[in-house]
Amino acid sequence: MAYNRLDDDYFDNRRPMNNRPPPHRTPSPGHPLQHGYQLDDAPYGRPGLNSASNLDIPMGPGRHTPSDQLQLHTAHSMANMSEPGYQQQPGGYRDEYSVNPEQHHDAYYNPTYTPTPNEAQTPYGEPGYEHDGRPLLPQQDSYGQYSDNPQQQQQQQGGLKRWKTVKRVPLYMGNLVLDCPVPPKLLNQFPHGERDEFTHMRYSAATCDPNDFYDEKFTLRQRLFSKPRETELFIVVTMYNEDEVLFARTMIGVFKNIEYMCKRPESKTWGKEAWKKIVVCIVSDGRAKINPRTRALLAGLGVYQEGIARQNVDDKPTTAHIYEYTTQIGMALKNDVVQLLPRQQPVQLLFCLKENNQKKINSHRWFFSAFGRVLNPNICVLLDAGTKPGGNSIYHLWKAFDLEPMCAGACGEIKAMLGTGGKNLFNPLVAAQNFEYKMSNILDKPLESAFGFISVLPGAFSAYRYIALQNDKNGQGPLEKYFAGEKLHGAGAGIFTANMYLAEDRILCFELVTKRNCHWILQYVKSATGETDVPDTATELILQRRRWLNGSFFAAIYAIAHFYQFFRSDHSFFRKIAFFIEFTFNTVNMIFAWFAIGNFFLVFKILTTSLGDETLLGTTGKILGVCFEWLYGVSLITCFVLAMGNRPAGSGPYYLAMIYFWAIIFCYLLFAAVFISVKAIMADAQRGLSVPELLKDQVVVTLILSIMSTYGIWLVASLLMFDPWHMFTSLVQYMLLSPTFTNVLNVYAFCNTHDISWGTKGDDKPDKLPSVSTKDGAGKADLPDEADLNTMYERELAVFAQKHVEEKKALTPSQLDEKQLDYYRGVRTVVVLLWMVTNFGLAAVVLSTAGLDRITPNTNAETKEQRATIYMAVVLYSVAALSGFKFIGAMWFLVVRMFRGV
């Protein structure tokens, strides 16, 4: 078979091949000097033996070529590279098949090519006589008929095959760029016509930093069409070592969204060709870290091929391997098995496989600074592998930007994945997190959206306007602040800044809204939903919340301390007043979060002590109070001990016991509150008080206020949002685990402020020693001659010829790490002590304990009781006011949404 150029009148099959160029003509992509590759089955000037079997592959825009025809002059065409992940199937192809990842894994760490072929013969003779115009093709027709005996074929193929000819691949603009034909098994599953974006995968070996990608003349396929494609939506899926099920879950949701937008023919932006305006970027954090099964799935989609990547280009190490392909293969999940479905909606895929593990923020830098600068998209959507967007959620996110020109960022509702029939709700940890997520999306996010500033747009599912992210001409701006956290390593990084950048998405939100001379706002889009897995074990939950709590706490302090930056923005006076109100609200919330552990103990102490009253439980109440106080103290001390010196992974049973202890304590608290309230109401009823008189009773008013400010507002807001089911399926679990959130998670987070890790570590490699080149068993090395020996000797003499001056040596990386860790531990001690002392002081002042009763010995019991009552009233009224404020904001969001439609 042969490759023929399509729609090219310049090529005449009746003429013999003439490599000499006509005078005054330079090569062009449409009419190259070489009119075709001379193949054994179709020499120059003659058609093949079977012209029907010729595969037409376009080589550039011809006279009648559509505007989206690719130009292949920007890449070196590599034909028929080995594809080990697939076995040829007799009798055609199956409509559906699963990925076989083991073959990819077995061959993944093999060298990318074999410089010295094992076989004695090559397809075209000796390598020294290889014709430069011949493509890398095996002698056998790779697109021919398949073997009728698959077992025999498998034996012949053996392991991973490497083509016998080693060719010199020219560089384009100093960069290695290859256009590689996709496997025949993949190609024949869908109609591809003349589009080489379907027939070829493009590989680029990036040998630069993401910030230099554009300047180093790297480009992407969308800019290589005759009419470069405009990118409206640029979607990134970041992953580390997620398996193929989690990855497929995300990609299925993305594919459904693209299909939904292609089915909107009346839209001015979308329609049948909408997929050309959408690029899906997959960034994997580390070549050694990627899950081999996920890598095999990417190969199944056509966007990855084994054996193509190169470690170095001209002695420059490759930093990222970039694969581009427009796939027509879909996916389906059946019983946690991924199946590939052919003939689906085309999707432009960009797969970036980073050479080293450099954390998620570096993956985002590749997305924004490298690829975003090339494509210049309108809207960027951020997804984590494992988060499944709803069938039209990405469209609704985009619509929010379309309706509001000043919207710089938007997020949707993050849902906890509950499994089939809600089976995951049987796990109390999942149910409690489900309730937490729901109430945050019903009260917190709508309130912040009503003001125009959302404290955090979750990186798992959010979107940004690309132009709003850009830095100013001085290099300062949102992206500059966002990526500053990537460089924080070593003792020079302060613990405050290091913890703050554990929640770098919060910093990005703050920098967007306060951008100089701009008036960008952030919005919450309830119509956009994304499902994600939540931790289902205590160990995973503790580790996750450590980063969340520390990052959000220090980022909130940063935002409050830099509130003055709002005045550099171009927001209106009333918008700035609204921001001031919101930040005041956030400050009050942060103060309550700081004193949460002290407030919880005070409520516990007051209620359990009250049960010892003679009108209630009397002596029994006193005994129970002492027992539960001891249980409380032991549990809290245990939490501190575990947090200060143990890893959660090695203390799972202890933390599980703590969860049960705190749940028992909460049950006793709930019993005390209900019992005291019922006794008070019964006493009032026996005195014959009317309803108006009952409402004047302090106990009754406190009871009603506390219930309505929490459960009442939760229920009403959930009903108004048409999402009340979590109140019936997850409320009890959340109540039982709320002491765990307050005590266990907060204690572990504050006791580990020195730990600024994300849970993943980079691949630190030792420095390489000078190498020795060997040939025929003999090594070559640079050895000094006599003159060099003399020079070196004189230099040694000069070292001690003068007085010794103390030289400050740079610390080694291990010493820097140890110094940094010691510094962080010291600051951790100060933070924990300050936190404990302030909370203990609050409890001592309210209860007149810890020696304060000796300072004021004349204080009677009635005064102490009155002080405790006043404190309880302040707490309850504050909680009620904060909840009411959230409710008002959520209602305003609901009213605005009725008119906006999003």
From Swiss-Prot:
Biased composition (Basic and acidic residues): 1-15
Membrane-topology annotation of the record: Multi-pass membrane protein
EC number(s) per entry: 2.4.1.16
Biased composition (Pro residues): 19-30
Pfam families from the UniProt entry: Chitin_synth_1, Chitin_synth_1N
Any one GO MF annotation of this record: chitin synthase activity
Gene induction: Expression is the lowest in vegetative hyphae and the highest in conidia. Expression levels are increased in appressoria and infected rice leaves in comparison with vegetative hyphae.
Gene Ontology BP terms: ascospore wall assembly; chitin biosynthetic process; septum digestion after cytokinesis
TM stretches of this protein: 449-469, 547-567, 577-597, 623-643, 656-676, 699-719, 731-751, 830-850, 874-894
UniProt keyword terms in alphabetical order: Cell membrane, Cell wall biogenesis/degradation, Glycoprotein, Glycosyltransferase, Membrane, Transferase, Transmembrane, Transmembrane helix
Subcellular localization, as worded in the UniProt entry: Cell membrane
Sugar-modified residues: 80
Coiled coil region boundaries: none
Record-level GO cellular component terms: cell septum; chitosome; plasma membrane
Reaction it catalyzes: [(1->4)-N-acetyl-beta-D-glucosaminyl](n) + UDP-N-acetyl-alpha-D-glucosamine = [(1->4)-N-acetyl-beta-D-glucosaminyl](n+1) + UDP + H(+)
InterPro entries from the UniProt entry: Chitin_synth, Chitin_synth_fun, Chitin_synth_N, Nucleotide-diphossugar_trans
Record family assignment: Belongs to the chitin synthase family. Class II subfamily.
Function of the molecule: Polymerizes chitin, a structural polymer of the cell wall and septum, by transferring the sugar moiety of UDP-GlcNAc to the non-reducing end of the growing chitin polymer. CHS1 and CHS3 have compensatory functions in cell wall modifications in responses to stresses. Might function as a negative regulator on expression of other CHS genes.
Protein name: Chitin synthase 3
Organism, as annotated: Pyricularia oryzae (strain 70-15 / ATCC MYA-4617 / FGSC 8958) (Rice blast fungus)
Higher taxonomy: Eukaryota, Fungi, Dikarya, Ascomycota, Pezizomycotina
